[in-house]
């Protein structure tokens, strides 16, 4: 009987500890939203665990999106305002207040990816007694990866991508800071993917729409609902500084036919801007002759040089945040190929990520 009681006690201990150390907050995703949630919680005396799938934290700002997308900087407050201030202070300390780097950081809204990651780590490090960050932890959003009590998440299982083993964590509150919404989906939170129909909420710009960039909907636009999601790309940190350059190798699976149409795009000047509605075939042929004679494109809306392919935003130290060129037929996006991403496995996502990188 005594042995039986001991065994029961051991089993009971395993069951209550099966989801490991408990935190006030368990945050899935080391993106800016997750990082800032942990920092604010720490300043309120709460403990947090951040589980990040990749080896780097910081999400988009630490991976190429160095030119902050914000139309009204006056609306910047809170922890993001603190982040931009720290960015600017870093460039002032390192290069001097009158340096080109400080000018190019645009009051802290433009930054090199490595600087963004450094600032995030600095802010997290100030709360190291309250915040635990674990990288290379993958949540597979499958049955058994969440422990639920009714509709409340109380535990999570992740894969340690370094060891291949499972790890279990519990928390009072769980935050989904992934770009995909994987935690919410796994917890059966209702969601929808794609564009709603024009008439569902009486939105004239909703649904399936075709148009030139910055134009009005063109013929063929139905306004119907579909499963389309915004195209994805890599924000390219390029440079004009020879000493900072890294060679870009030709991918093994490079397919020339995917880019052949770019030759005609360059010669004729054709693009996706609204001005193309008024461009004639005669104008494009005249543009072709001018370029073949050593001139530059004069077609309305056309870009020249590398900006034919990407939109260049200046960052400090001669670097760039190169985004998709919305005015081009071929750029860094792969529209429609990415549509399965939100609900696909990590195996599919990794394959698409490589496909996009190679492209």
Question: What positions do the PLM features span?
Answer:
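Beta1/beta-strand and adjacent pyrophosphate-binding region of the FAD-binding site
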Residues: 21-31
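Aromatic pocket-lining residues of Rossmann-like dinucleotide-binding sites
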Residues: 41
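Conserved N-terminal/central alpha/beta ligand/cofactor-binding core
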Residues: 46-47, 52-146, 192, 201, ...
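Flavin (FAD/FMN)-binding glycine-rich loop and adjacent Rossmann-like elements that form
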Residues: 136-139, 144-155, 162-173, 177-359
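Sec-dependent N-terminal signal peptides
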Residues: 5-15
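N-terminal Rossmann-fold NAD(P) dinucleotide-binding loop
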Residues: 34
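Sec/Tat signal peptide C-region and signal peptidase I cleavage site
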Residues: 16-20
């Amino acid at each position: 009987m005594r042995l039986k009681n001991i065994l029961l006690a051991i089993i009971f201990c395993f069951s209550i500890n099966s989801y490991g150390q408990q935190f006030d907050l368990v945050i899935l995703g080391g993106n800016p939203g997750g990082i800032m949630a942990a920092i604010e919680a720490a300043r309120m005396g709460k403990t947090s665990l951040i589980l990040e799938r990749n080896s780097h934290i910081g999400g988009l700002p630490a991976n190429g999106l160095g030119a902050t997308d914000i139309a009204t900087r006056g609306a910047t407050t809170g922890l993001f305002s603190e982040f931009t201030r720290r960015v600017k202070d870093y460039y002032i300390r390192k290069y001097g207040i009158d340096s080109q780097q400080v000018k190019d950081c645009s009051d802290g809204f433009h930054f090199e990816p490595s600087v963004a990651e450094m600032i995030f780590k600095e802010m997290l490090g100030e709360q190291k007694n309250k915040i635990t960050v674990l990288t290379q932890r993958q949540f597979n959003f499958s049955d058994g990866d969440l422990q639920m009590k009714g509709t409340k998440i109380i535990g999570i299982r992740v894969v340690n991508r370094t060891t291949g083993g499972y790890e279990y964590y519990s928390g009072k509150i769980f935050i989904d800071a992934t770009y995909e919404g994987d935690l919410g989906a796994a917890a059966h939170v209702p969601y929808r993917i794609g564009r709603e129909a024009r008439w569902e909420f009486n939105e004239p710009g909703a649904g399936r729409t075709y148009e030139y960039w910055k134009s009005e909907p063109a013929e063929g636009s139905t306004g119907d609902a579909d499963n389309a999601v915004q195209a994805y790309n890599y924000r390219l940190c390029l440079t004009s500084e020879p000493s900072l350059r890294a060679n870009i190798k030709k991918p093994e699976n490079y397919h020339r036919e995917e880019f052949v149409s770019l030759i005609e795009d360059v010669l004729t000047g054709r693009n996706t801007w609204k001005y193309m509605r008024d461009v004639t075939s005669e104008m494009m042929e005249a543009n072709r002759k001018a370029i073949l004679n050593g001139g530059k494109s004069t077609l309305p809306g056309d870009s020249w040089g590398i900006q034919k392919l990407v939109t260049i935003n200046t960052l400090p130290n001669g670097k760039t945040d190169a985004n998709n060129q919305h005015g081009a037929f071929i750029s860094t996006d792969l529209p429609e190929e990415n549509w399965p991403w939100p609900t696909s496995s990590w195996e599919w996502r990794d394959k698409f990520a490589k496909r996009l990188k190679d492209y």
